[in-house]
Structures are given as C-alpha cells and as structure tokens.
Amino acid sequence: MDVDQVVAQWIEEEQAVRDRLQAPDAMPRGQALSLTGMEVFEAIFAGELPPPPIGDTLDFLPMYMEPGVAVFQGRPGRRHYNPMGTVHGGWFATLLDSAVGCAVHTTLAVGKGYTTLELKLNVVRALTDAVPLVRAEGKVIHVGSQVATAEGRIVGPDGRLYAHATTTCLIFDHPTTPSMSAGGRG
C-alpha cells in the first residue's frame, strides 16, 4: 500500500473505533476494580466504559488492545507545536506513555493497578501536521508481581519511525476502602 492508502485505511479504522466509543470521561477510580486490565479495554471498545479524556485533549485514541499490546492513533496538529514549529516532545511522551502503560494494563488481574515509574523517550525525527496520522504501539517486555516494563514506537503511515520509548511501571493492589467504593478519592 502507498502512504495515501494507509492514511485512508487508518482514517476508516479510526472512525469505526469512534463509532463504538462513549464520549471521553474520567472513570471513577473504583469502577473498574472488578475487571481485569484487558476487560477494562474490552468494555471501553464496546462502549460500556468511557475512554480517558486525555486522548480528547491531545487528539489521540486507543485503536486496538490485546494482552501485552496497545495501539493508539494520534493526529499531530499545530496546537501541539513547540516554539520551533514542530510537535512538542510532551505530545510524543504522552502518546507513548499511553501506549506502553496500557500494554502493561492489559496484563493485569482483577484488583491490580499500575503507575508509570519511569518513561525514557527518544524523539528521532521531527513531526509536523504534514504527517496527518501516526500510530503508537506499546508492547510488554516483562510483567512481574511488582514491576513491569514495556517498549513503544511511534510510526507514520509510511512506516517511518518518529519516536521510541521504554517504561518501567509499578504494579500494586488497588485499595478497596469504603470511600473508594462510594466514588471517593480514597
């Protein structure tokens, strides 16, 4: 496929995902405690749970999940530019943090959570809105009882690499206090 065909396919796939998703919203912390990480994403893709609002803020969305893998699609735009006229490194970092973190999340059991301990980002090529879409794919390297690692890449529709990252995530038991089950902050 040439680049225009890939872009057209990615746009079509994005629309199919958007048609199934609820409006982005913050999910109450305790709402997903009875689900595995993979079940959370299955519920998001089925329109039963909302996707996180960060994707709406930075114009990216989850496209596909399987255990140990998470794929996001982003639209780099002028609103993401830094003073040099290219996409800000924070946009790359947030997109890749989502991909690698969610790859880890897909492997978690009921009652488990995670947080990013470290994110190492390498931006290897400048990005502008001349590239209409990019994909970020996160893949798990290792999942243990307390620590997980994953790697990710951002590529354009022509297959060019724009950035890559690794993460270390802390895995923990979700607290189950009465205030959390009532929607509080715990």
Predicted regions and their residues:
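Terminal targeting signals and extreme-terminal segments of soluble enzymes
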Residues: 1-186
